[in-house]
Amino acid sequence: MKKSTLLFSLMAMALSGCNSVLNAPIEVKKLVYQIEHTDPAWQQHLKQLAEIKNYEVKGQFGYISPTERFSAHFDWQYKTPIDFTLALSSNLSTKLLKLQRSHQGLTVSDSEGYSRTEADIHALMQEIIGVSFPIDQFAYWVKGQPAQEGNYIVNEKRQLSQFSYPINQQIWQARYVEYHENRVPYLPKLIVLENGQQTLKIRLDHWNY
């Protein structure tokens, strides 16, 4: 299946009746002050996030590029670095696209019977969305858990505010626009990822762990 066909599969699930995530804000609130990475409360928060190993989160995913714009519901189920599933679907269609990680690599399949497995998961992601997106890192990003030695900023609430991540000579900028603050630890509610040409908006509505 060519990249254009994979993108068409995603676009076929566009939520014409529910485009709120595409119109969601992309800027984080202005920092009151920035927290050092060694701050004890921040380190305690990181420890709490690390303890969330097996989880599920549901929400809405929006993709914007110069030539494509679509959104879909998602269901992300994570168990281990080699056992996770991302399912994309729409209320307006029976179409389903699923990405599943296993020992064999990454499998992409749809509700029409197509299935393909690649050991090179980054190459497959390149075909799907046009960039070698690090889906293996996504498991940590959705929790607001940065790489230990990463380039990131922590806000005054001891929440991850933003970070940058290099991929194939491109820099992805991540901004954590909103958090669920009715539970501990605080978990992200709206994340925006941009690389200058593509924007991914991820609204995380329901957490279960």
Swiss-Prot record:
Stretch forming the signal peptide: 1-17
One Pfam family hit: LolB
Major location (coarse): membrane
Keywords: Cell outer membrane, Chaperone, Lipoprotein, Membrane, Palmitate, Protein transport, Signal, Transport
GO cellular component terms attached to this protein's record: cell outer membrane
Membrane topology: Lipid-anchor
Residues bearing a lipid moiety (S-diacylglycerol cysteine): 18
GO BP, one annotated term: lipoprotein localization to outer membrane
Localization annotation: Cell outer membrane
InterPro entries: LolA/LolB/LppX, OM_lipoprot_LolB
Keyword Transport part of the UniProt annotation: yes
Positions where lipid (N-palmitoyl cysteine) attaches: 18
General function of this protein: Plays a critical role in the incorporation of lipoproteins in the outer membrane after they are released by the LolA protein.
Quaternary data: Monomer.
Family named by the database record: Belongs to the LolB family.
Protein name: Outer-membrane lipoprotein LolB
Gene designation per UniProt: lolB
